[in-house]
């Protein structure tokens, strides 16, 4: 299973369906215990899941994207600037959480934040002016 967290969370959710409908459409049934645990760790309130994407802030919606990815239990997680809508402290907390909860999952991180990449990566491939370094 492959999950992806996009840079712009508004483009990763359909605008006319609630967040929970879209998560269940991909993940299927979700245990309340598991859902509540992730909600707590991501500092999300359950009532936000029943709203449509445009009713949430960018940071809230990005954390919903992360929630969806966690609930998928992927073997590989592709993340494109996953913390772009989050402040620095929350961004590092979210990456710590992803690494901890997805212990047996490969994570491919695309980021402009070299400090973040150095902090959380085993291997870094840097692209600069179309050259691989």
Give the ranges of each region predicted by the language model.
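Hydrophobic anchor residue at the start of the ABC signature
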Residues: 66, 94
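Conserved catalytic motifs of ABC-family nucleotide-binding domains
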Residues: 73
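Catalytic Walker B motif of ABC-type/P-loop ATPase nucleotide-binding domains
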Residues: 77-81
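Q-loop/switch helix immediately C-terminal to the Walker
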Residues: 8, 15-30
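Conserved ABC ATPase signature
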Residues: 52-56, 60
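Conserved H-loop
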Residues: 105-110
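Conserved ABC ATPase "signature" region
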Residues: 32-47
């Amino acid at each position: 299973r492959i999950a992806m967290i996009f840079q712009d969370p508004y483009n990763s959710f359909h605008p006319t369906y609630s967040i929970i409908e879209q998560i269940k459409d991909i993940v299927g049934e979700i245990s309340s215990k598991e859902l509540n645990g992730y909600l707590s760790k991501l500092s999300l309130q359950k009532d936000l899941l029943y709203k449509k994407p445009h009713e949430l802030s960018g940071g809230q919606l990005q954390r919903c994207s992360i929630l969806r990815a966690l609930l998928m239990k992927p073997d590989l997680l592709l993340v494109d600037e996953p913390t772009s809508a989050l402040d620095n402290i929350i961004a590092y907390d979210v990456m710590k959480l992803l690494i901890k909860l997805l212990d047996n999952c490969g994570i491919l991180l695309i980021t402009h934040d070299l400090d973040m990449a150095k902090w959380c990566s085993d291997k870094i491939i840097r692209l600069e002016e179309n050259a691989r370094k």
